[in-house]
Amino acid sequence: MCGIAGICRLDGQPLNEDARAHVRAMTDVITYRGPDGSGIWQEGPVSLGHRRLSIIDLSGGSQPMQDVDGELCIVFNGEIYNFAELRQELLQAGARFHSSH
């Protein structure tokens, strides 16, 4: 059971570094939900934080996760059991991955 926290300015204005500190404080409060790791990503009006409980993909599941171009970011809590099939479908559609899993 991981933990997710974040701030988003609905007016589109960029967040300052105080927002990162606030998200860090939010993820610190939920450390019990994910004691195995944490991460924060901030860009423009969005700051995302994650606390990780490692069950599957122990070494490569650090979050927040970005696409290979650094344009998209996601925090995710759950398991995708058909990931191999989805990966093949996405590869055939031209998607690029920066991990082997």
What are these regions (language model features)?
Residues 1-101:
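N-terminus-centric sequence/structural signature that marks the extreme N-terminus
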